[in-house]
A protein has these predicted regions:
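Loop-to-transmembrane helix boundary motifs in multi-pass membrane proteins
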Residues: 19-20, 57-60, 217, 229, ...
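Membrane-interface loop-to-helix entry segments
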Residues: 62-63, 71-101, 288-290, 294, ...
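Flexible loop linkers connecting adjacent transmembrane helices
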Residues: 1-21, 46, 194-209, 309-314
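Helix-loop-helix module between adjacent transmembrane segments
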Residues: 20-40, 45-75, 130-131, 226-231
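Membrane-helix boundary/coupling elements in multi-pass transport proteins
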Residues: 29-48, 177-184, 188, 217-245
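Extracellular/periplasmic helix-exit of transmembrane alpha-helices
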Residues: 1-4, 145-149, 154, 174-203
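Hydrophobic alpha-helical segments and their helix-loop junctions in multi-pass secondary transporters
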Residues: 87-114, 126-145, 300-309, 334-342
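C-terminal membrane-solvent junction of multi-pass transporters and transport-like membrane proteins
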Residues: 82-85, 241, 255-260, 279, ...
Length: 343
């Protein structure tokens, strides 16, 4: 969408949807961004507690201040380089952690492709779905692509950029999948495989030391810290993009609407952290909230990218459109199952 139309998802929603629908969608996306910021600030704060014994609330303030300074004093290009560095550290950390455990690949490989819904697991399943396919990122990706500002009237440039972004997206998804898989494999081998119950992140960190050595617990905390910081940065940027889109404007950290969006997401998330009694449950339920909003963003994006008015000749094919609608339907069905599990 960013390449073909020159608009990000939030701008396109405001431009092509009825105002009451556009505002409802974008305000719900802002709530999703707040949920993301809550989880990511919490994750960074928990990591600071693991490393330096800093209380959660004080650590949250430090993460918040650092992220605001990063966003308000750097261009996207600079932030992009920082994010790449952070993600590289996270990936290398979990590769090292995996080298310390023995993986039962005969069990792990089938589990990668075999879905299971154990009793009472829907909250965790949906929180993982929300954490992996974050709705705010769908807004941010189109904004990032749009910000490159190429000539959208030149078909050769558009086709070249579409091929590049397709490859870039696949590579990013593979890296994300690898890091998420590494975390799950580590938890399964170190804790589940040894019959060690874990209900808190701090507990996981403290148990890694006797199981895998002191280095393992420190590296786990470092990876968690960089994951929290990098994700809080992207969540803040997404909120700025979403809020600016309500006014049919692109993300620009120098613009008041973008700044209001960033601060709204981060400050409200911080305020919620101040009243959360159980940080681990706060992480779970905030990510579950993302999965609830996800179908709204999916259906919005599919509708807009399937419109010739928005995309011109680059709109989704009929096959792609209905495949994406089916995926959105599956996510919606999972949310219905989640609701039923609470009844």
């Amino acid at each position: 969408m960013g390449i073909a139309s020159g608009l990000c998802l939030s701008e396109a929603a405001s431009e092509y949807l009825k105002p009451r629908y556009a505002k409802g969608i974008l305000y719900s996306a802002m709530l999703a961004s707040i949920s993301t910021s809550l989880a990511e600030i919490l994750g960074g704060a928990i990591a600071l507690q693991m490393l330096f014994n800093i209380p959660i609330r004080a650590g949250s303030i430090l993460v918040l201040i650092f992220v605001v300074i990063m966003l308000f004093t750097n261009t996207y290009r600079v932030i992009e380089k920082w994010i790449i560095a952070f993600v590289s550290i996270i990936g290398l950390s979990f590769i090292y952690e995996l080298s310390l455990v023995e993986i039962d690949w005969n069990t792990a490989l089938p589990a990668w492709v075999t879905p299971a819904f154990p009793e009472g697991s829907m909250v965790v399943i949906m929180s993982v779905l929300g954490a992996v396919v974050m709705p705010h990122n769908l807004f941010l990706h189109s904004e990032v692509i749009q910000s490159r500002q190429w000539n959208i009237q030149d078909d050769k440039i558009i086709k070249k950029q579409l091929r590049y972004e397709y490859a870039d997206t696949i590579l990013s998804m593979v890296i994300g999948w690898a890091i998420n898989s590494a975390m799950i494999l580590l938890a399964a081998a170190a804790f589940f495989g040894t019959g060690t119950p874990v209900t808190e992140l701090e507990q996981a960190n403290s148990l890694l030391a006797p199981l895998l050595g002191n280095n393992a617990s420190v590296i786990f905390a470092v990876a968690l810290l960089f994951a929290g910081i990098s994700s809080t940065i992207t969540s803040g940027m997404a909120a700025g993009s979403i809020f600016a889109g309500i006014y049919k404007e692109p993300y620009d950290i120098k613009d008041s609407h973008s700044r209001i969006g960033v601060l709204t997401s981060l400050i409200l998330a911080f305020a919620l952290i101040m009243v959360v009694s159980n940080p681990f449950q706060g992480l779970i339920y905030s990510q579950m909230a993302l999965s609830v909003q996800l179908p709204i963003t999916i259906f919005t994006q599919v509708y807009l990218t399937s419109s010739s008015k928005v995309m011109g000749k680059y709109k989704n094919s009929t096959y792609t459109k209905w495949l994406l609608y089916v995926i959105g339907g599956i996510v919606t069905l999972l949310n219905v199952m989640l609701l039923i599990s609470f009844l």
